[in-house]
Amino acid sequence: METMTLGFRIRPVASDVALDDACVVRAESYGHHLPEMKSAYSEPDDLDRDGSATTFLAIDKVSGAPIGSVRIQLSTLGSTLLLERSWAAPDWLQTLPRAELTRMSVVSGADPMVKLLLWKAGLYYCLANQMHCMVIGARKPALIRQYASLGFEPLTTEPVPFAHAGHLPHHVLWFNVATLERRWYESNHRLYGFMFGTHHPDLDLFGPRWRPSPPAPVEVVPS
């Protein structure tokens, strides 16, 4: 297997500082296209804080600056997926272990490989946690076409307003994680070698993860 080292590292967010760095990346990336969302994305949200999702952060090796981030929520951890709070998933989907990728963000001017390796982090995290499928929301036709080229299929015919994305309308798409390797191999997909035939030592899926701090003890003063 080929080994590829890159100019950045990807790790799970493991501290409040790293979570804030992820929010900086989100605010810059989304705020570039949606200035009205920049403020909302600059702070951790409830899903970041409840411990039911894992956020990965890409850090430039030279500058130490945060340059990319993605968040993955698993249905098996007991929290309703964000898009399913705005959209009624079909019964067949609700029976499957599934993951939602949100807040995919890369700063302007970053290495194009950052987004690819964030996708690999999401894919392998799903495989490691035995997810059957992955779901995402996409707004722009160009982005929907990108997802379709990866093997995503539409679950909606009309866009759905997402409460967690400023009520902007999104299409819901999904793909089967469990069969992806075989399908990409059989179709000679252009990313097969990168995703399944290359070792990336700069990608760490299972390092320390951020956990919500326990509540401070309440001091009881004798009456």
For each feature predicted by the language model, list its residue ranges.
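Acidic/histidine-enriched, glycine/proline-rich intrinsically disordered or flexible terminal extensions
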Residues: 181-223
